[in-house]
Amino acid sequence: MMARRDPTSWAKRLVRAQTLQKQRRAPVGPRAPPPDEEDPRLKCKNCGAFGHTARSTRCPMKCWKAALVPATLGKKEGKENLKPWKPRGEANPGPLNKDKGEKEERPRQQDPQRKALLHMFSGKPPEKPLPNGKGSTESSDYLRVASGPMPVHTTSKRPRLDPVLADRSATEMSGRGSVLASLSPLRKASLSSSSSLGPKERQTGAAADMPQPAVRHQGREPLLVVKPTHSRPEGGCREVPQAASKTHGLLQASRPQAQDKRPAVTPQPCPPAATHSLGLGSNLSFGPGAKRPAQAPIQACLNFPKKPRLGPFQIPESAIQGGELGAPENLQPPPAATELGPSTSPQMGRRTPAQVPSVDRQPPHSRPCLPTAQACTMSHHSAAGHDGAQPLRVLFRRLENGRWSSSLLAAPSFHSPEKPGAFLAQSPHVSEKSEAPCVRVPPSVLYEDLQVSSSSEDSDSDLE
């Protein structure tokens, strides 16, 4: 029976058994980790990762071959300047330097042409070259050469004469007279007197169309411009544009001594002119003194201000004519004005204290701006005992709410300039005929408005 057993067969069986054991140990697919290594609550002490322990073969610290080495993303040849350029010399200029050189040569070639044109227009001789042979190479040199004298800026400038007065001879300009108008001395201003009118305008008696410019002073106050003349009394109306100041009333000026021995002159209207503020009472001096005084009367005209807020009330184009400026006071009205009602006396009584001459005080600002004021001048022929004729002026003012008030104003005598209150109210004779009516509103409308507004003015005086 022992001979029947083959040793080769036994060896084959042993090999088969060993192969089967190897196949059982080595799995066909990936080996699943044991359940203890998959616990996320575990933490490796070597790498600090969760899911395995330090003894596990999954730890990258134990198997470095399995760890991936970080590879570079790429070379930075375009960003890094591995081969910097060398600075190019003038012998081998680059394309940018060539363009700059061409641009610099062009203006240098144009400099001689520009200088030639500059000398042609300015009329100056050409500049001599420098001894070292180096001229100005800047392209903006032609802008620095002045073609004419630089303007000189001064603070005080003389007023420009009108084109009509520009062709006057030197004799007429030297014969200009100076006129001093003495008013309430609230403020003082000095104005330059304008030239006399042309011979044609003297014959017609028309005022100059273009008003003379005057020096502008501080504040919004009226401006007074007086034009002396050496012609006969029929000369044109002198322009005295002036807006009423903050106190209510009108201004009067004293006449020259030459007028006291002459008859009354018919007043003529004056065109409106631009006005600037000076004040109610100011001492005005005009121009340089002449060899002889003015032989013609100075006729004042109060004209329209440019804006209503420049003065307490507006003055229409038809202004007061035939009289001069001065300090107004109350006068007893003539028989033609006695029917106007009691509204005139309290109003003028309130305004007279504000017009007392004072140097340091300013006009009060109590009353609001009144809309309009219209004045009329009537010839006042004095009786025996008065040398000259003095005009009598009636002032109509339009108050608030369409009310009207009237007042009588007369020019003072020239013999007593220190007393502005000396009026010609002593003369009982007053002509009833108005030589130069200035009021455009019918008298009946004024009388009705004054009679209706008498009670309202009394209430205003009580409130003030």
Curated annotation (Swiss-Prot):
Biased composition (Low complexity): 180-197
Location of region: Disordered: 1-42, 69-389, 415-437
PANTHER family the UniProt entry points to: FAMILY WITH SEQUENCE SIMILARITY 90 MEMBER A11, PSEUDOGENE-RELATED (PTHR16035:SF14), PROTEIN FAM90A1 (PTHR16035)
Lineage, top ranks: Eukaryota, Metazoa, Chordata, Craniata, Vertebrata
UniProt-listed InterPro entries: FAM90, Znf-CCHC_6
Protein name (Swiss-Prot/TrEMBL): Protein FAM90A24
Family to which this protein belongs: Belongs to the FAM90 family.
Note in the entry: Primate-specific FAM90A gene family, thought to have arisen during multiple duplication and rearrangement events.
One matching Pfam family: zf-CCHC_6
Taxonomic source organism: Homo sapiens
Biased composition (Basic and acidic residues): 74-89, 97-114
Sections of the chain in a coiled coil: none
